[in-house]
């Protein structure tokens, strides 16, 4: 059991290291607000007009302290945008904390977010526990998958956003917290409100600065720059010099990428591991040139969940 735990910890650290390096690669983008200058300085990563415009909006919003709501399908890069907002803000030298609202058990999420006072329950820390909201004080709290937050926690979060005060579980003393909120979802929250699954008042509290990130299929000009960047990254990681053939690149361009950037990254990583030659050919790429349908239909706006992640 000990050896298994050590192995799992090592694998987690490796994955975190890779993600950190990729995020840093993504964030080698211009801080300029002017679209022409932004295009000139970032030709290697995003060349589509949609993303050049989006990054201009991100740069403007980042300078404020406004609450931000990121909308987009699974895998479009909402995490990267959230971190960029933090990196360009006045809070950049403070803490950035990401909370995956969909992965924390419902019976634990209250204490995870708000913390608890000493002696609140049997087995609790004698000194109490600081919550993630409090831990992010002065910095940015990224609430990923906000649409998965249970209704009781939506109420508590709304109260916090109204007063910017928290009260640890088991405590009677409120505490003022200065933190910027960035939330993200791949769900259509207006549809969720109509179904009684999301509070309308919380939605309007979050809907201050809204950034809608287009899917990869709608910005074809970004596919090859991203694919080449991932290939350079994973080629370097695995000590290989790799390149795509023209036919392979054509195949990548023709595919519709229902899993967006994450699907592209995972595919390229797999190719970097399994390719027998330095040139990756179309026959090596495990996708069809014909567009594959997304896992769920477009009937519900932004509700395109493939695996519940963003």
How should these model regions be labeled?
Residues 127-138, 142, 150-156, 167-186, ...:
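AAA+/SF3 P-loop NTPase mechanochemical coupling elements
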Residues 298-310:
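Bacterial C-terminal helix-turn-helix
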């Amino acid at each position: 059991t000990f050896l298994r735990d050590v192995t799992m910890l090592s694998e987690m650290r490796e994955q975190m290291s890779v993600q950190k390096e990729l995020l840093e690669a993504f964030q080698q983008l211009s801080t300029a607000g002017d679209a022409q200058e932004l295009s000139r300085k970032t030709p290697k990563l995003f060349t589509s007009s949609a993303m050049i415009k989006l990054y201009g909006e991100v740069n403007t919003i980042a300078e404020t302290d406004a609450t931000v709501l990121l909308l987009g399908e699974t895998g479009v890069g909402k995490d990267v945008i959230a971190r960029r907002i933090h990196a360009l803000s006045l809070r950049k030298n403070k803490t950035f904390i990401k909370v995956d609202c969909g992965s924390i058990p419902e019976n634990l999420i209250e204490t995870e977010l708000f913390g608890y006072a000493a002696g609140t329950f049997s087995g609790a820390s004698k000194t109490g526990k600081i919550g993630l909201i409090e831990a992010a004080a002065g910095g940015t709290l990224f609430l990923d998958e906000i649409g998965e937050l249970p209704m009781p926690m939506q109420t508590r979060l709304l109260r916090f956003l109204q007063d910017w005060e928290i009260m640890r579980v088991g405590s009677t003393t409120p505490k003022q917290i200065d933190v910027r909120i960035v939330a993200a979802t791949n769900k259509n929250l207006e549809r969720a409100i109509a179904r009684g699954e999301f509070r309308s008042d919380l939605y309007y509290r979050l809907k201050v600065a809204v950034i809608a990130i287009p899917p990869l299929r709608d910005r074809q000009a970004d596919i090859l720059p991203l694919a080449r960047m991932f290939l350079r990254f994973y080629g370097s990681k695995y000590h290989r010099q790799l390149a795509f053939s023209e036919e392979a690149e054509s195949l990548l361009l023709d595919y519709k990428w229902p899993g967006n950037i994450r699907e592209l990254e995972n595919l390229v990583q797999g190719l970097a591991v399994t390719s027998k030659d330095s040139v990756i050919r179309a026959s090596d790429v495990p996708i069809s040139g014909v567009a594959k349908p997304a896992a769920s239909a477009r009937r519900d706006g932004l509700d395109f969940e493939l695996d519940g992640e963003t």
